[in-house]
Amino acid sequence: QKVSVEFDDNRMENLFILPDLPDTAIPMGANVTYFGPGVHNAGVIRIANESGRILYLDEGAVVLGRIEAENAANLTIRGRGVFCSSQEDHGAGRRPQMEFRNCDNLKIEGILLRDTPNWTLKIVGSTGVHIDNIKEIGWIMNSDGMDFICCRDVLVENTFQRNYDDNVTIKAFNATPEYIASHTNTDGSYSDGAIWMVAGLRDFEVCNYEIRNCVFWADKAHNMLVGPEARGIAFRNIRFHDNIVLENRQDDGIYPGAMAVM
């Protein structure tokens, strides 16, 4: 069980109790980056053009930094430790806590993510994503829990997410040749700035999502959101089920509620 305890109706300084079973399958090998108990100032961890990399955060580990991964296959980030971005820029230059682009067979499991400067998990153009039993605590505007952009074959399960902004968002940006041609200004700039985020992707399809057995708490925005910032790309086979919404203070007059399809 994952529990929030609030004293005297104070929902901003509540106590989280997030127990876990011990992890008895600690990985070993040359492909493993191991963070043991204690504080680790990792800075920016960059992973590119690799296969089979494992980042393991053991119980008692607090890793300070953020992650950027691109063109990685079979990447795993797991353990019982904490990944914290409290030392990162939370001002004008703030970046997501973890960014993944063109990463196939990505797994994130067991860890606690806290104090993201921006989106917590930004996953772009990736296939075969499995997120299991992670915990998130984000307090800042734009602290989305998970933003999937043009991803396919995604399973999210057993998470506990308390974020100021949206918890799970499924987006579809567009950078097909036809779309770029119709959104290019005479000076060569793009009228749709989101093109830069997905330019060069192999595929823009958005399909096959299952989000199940999760606990959501959004302070300001939606807990579950499908379709914001869509650019002419179809959404197919997306399923949310058996999830719990602890808190929903979303106040959008056009798309209100714990979940919205926009």
Where are these regions (language model features)?
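Short hydrophobic beta-strand that contains or immediately precedes a catalytic carboxylate
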Residues: 34-35, 56-57, 67
